[in-house]
């Protein structure tokens, strides 16, 4: 069995911008006073997940590789850019901090819907949560003190509501990736299994 998922890679320049945003947020007073409050995503591991699959056997991987190649040719490249700060579950009960996406979202949604349909055909259960395009910046630490976390969440909410304009770079999505995730003591490591190009000549 391999732990796998389907995702879009994020360009190096965009990762640098997201790292700069993380560094800026870390300077907010509650986060500066208690840096361990949030577990920040390593920007080297950033990607836009279209469908997490989990344990995948050899036969399923073969079906997925063929299916992804077949569906990729039906989708043209499209552009995305980052948008405002957001969170799951809520600012009063913060679990995940993320930056949203804008741009050609309909093309992104169509691609994700095809990936979801393929996953079901291969035998995976339907995804319970509606697809919400985002890039995860941080997760709440398991031992986070609630009063301090509430204070940090309030600062983050203000940043999100101020919606300070960033000079985000647009990025072109031209490939779909089938990725293996290997969990270890230093966190997850990712290995690309298959890359499927989105053709320009549709």
Where are these predicted regions, by residue range?
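Histidine-dependent nucleotide/RNA phosphoesterase domain, centered on the 2H-phosphoesterase fold
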Residues: 1-202
């Amino acid at each position: 069995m391999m732990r796998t998922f389907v995702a879009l890679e994020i360009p190096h320049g965009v990762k640098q911008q997201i790292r700069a945003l993380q560094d800026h947020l870390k300077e907010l007073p509650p986060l500066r006073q208690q840096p361990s409050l949030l577990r920040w995503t390593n920007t080297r591991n950033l990607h836009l997940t279209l469908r997490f699959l989990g344990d995948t056997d050899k036969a399923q991987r073969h079906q997925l590789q063929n299916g992804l190649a077949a569906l990729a040719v039906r989708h043209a490249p499209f552009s995305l850019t980052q948008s405002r700060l957001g969170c799951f579950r809520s600012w009063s009960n913060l679990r995940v901090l993320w930056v949203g996406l804008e741009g050609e979202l309909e093309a992104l949604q169509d691609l994700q819907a095809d990936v979801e349909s393929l996953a079901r055909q291969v035998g995976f259960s339907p995804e319970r949560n509606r697809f919400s395009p985002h890039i995860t910046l941080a997760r709440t630490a398991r031992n986070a003190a609630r009063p301090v976390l509430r204070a940090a969440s309030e600062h983050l909410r203000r940043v999100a509501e101020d919606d300070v304009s960033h000079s985000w770079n647009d990025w072109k999505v031209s490939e779909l990736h089938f990725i293996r995730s290997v969990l270890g003591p230093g966190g997850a490591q990712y290995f690309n299994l298959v890359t499927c190009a989105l053709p320009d000549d549709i």
